[in-house]
Every structure is written in C-alpha cells, then in structure tokens.
A protein has these predicted regions:
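Active-site-adjacent structural elements in enzyme catalytic cores
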Residues: 21-176
Length: 176
C-alpha cells in the first residue's frame, strides 16, 4: 500500500544558519501537523543538524515497517532512535558511566550511542533489528527537537533517502 510522506521544512531552510534559527509561528504550525502525522503512524521528512531524516513513531511496529519499505532498507539494518534528552534516552538504553559522560559532553549533537536496551524499553524490536542494543541520539536542531517533543514519543529516523543512495543534505533531495 502507499504511504503518505509529510515533508517538514520551510522552503528557505537551506539558506538559514540552523544553529541560530528560531522557530516562528508558521514553522510551529507545520511542526505540530507533522507531530500529529507521527502519532498517526505516518512518515515525516525532517531536518537534523547533519542530514534530513525519515521519521516515524519508534514504538510502532507498523510505522517502523513503513520506514524499511519506503527506503528499501534491509530489516537487519537497525534504525537510529531520536529523543529529546539524556533523561529520555535512559528510558531506552543502559548507560555506563563512560557512556553517560560522553552523552553529557556531546549531546545534543551529531553523535549516536549504541547501548544495551533497558528491560522496559518500549521501542519496536523491528527498529533495533531484534538486537539487544539500541542506537540513540539527541539531535541539535530546533525543528527536530520540537518535532520529537510535540510528537511526545521517540522517533526512529534513518536518513531520508533510498537505501544505498547518498544521504540528503538539502530539502529537495528527500525521498519523493
């Protein structure tokens, strides 16, 4: 079946310095709409500080399956789970002292930590490819952070390109 992909970004985004960007009312309206799409199990294309991501509710098997289908990604290739904070990440991953020190130093930012899953982890096993580990990240991008916050759930988000293709760094390169 066909899946709807909502692309979340202002058309001028690539011209802005994302680290100085503030979210205006129009962007907030788009983010709220995209968060609802995430909650409804749909896919959303959104910017991070590195590449554009293809996001879905990380706790939903159906939503995660849509990511793999849309990208043509092998299901044995786990996804990165984007969260809002270290505190939230600790609900899903077991942090050693070293991992916690690294997270405090580099998050938010373009670092993914691979950690053992917590026993109460609610992330779809499909998102972690059935592994006992989980890839966690706290992005440093205002749109990504606001989307995760508004969706009120972790977002599984690989890059928004077909599997094996170059990761998109511009809005127009996101999966059609």
């Amino acid at each position: 079946s066909a899946y709807r992909l909502v692309k979340l970004w202002p058309s001028q985004l690539e011209y802005w310095n994302i680290f100085e960007m503030t979210i205006n009312a129009m962007m907030l309206k788009e983010i709220k709409a995209a968060a609802i799409q995430i909650q409804e199990g749909e896919l959303v294309g959104f910017p991070t500080e590195t590449v554009y991501g293809l996001g879905a509710d990380a706790t939903s098997d159906d939503a995660v399956t849509k990511i793999f289908s849309t990208k043509g990604r092998p299901k044995f290739n786990p996804l990165i789970i984007h969260v809002t904070s270290i505190e939230e990440a600790r609900q899903y991953g077991v942090f050693s002292k070293a991992a916690l020190d690294i997270a405090h130093h580099f998050w938010p930012g373009p670092l993914t930590l691979i950690l053992p899953r917590t026993t109460e982890c609610s992330i779809s096993w499909l998102a972690t490819a059935g592994l006992s580990t989980i890839a966690l990240r706290v992005p440093d991008h205002p749109i990504a952070n606001e989307l995760i916050k508004r969706a009120d759930r972790p977002i599984a988000a690989p890059s928004a390109n077909r599997s094996g293709k170059i990761s998109p760094t511009r809005a127009e390169d996101v999966i059609e």
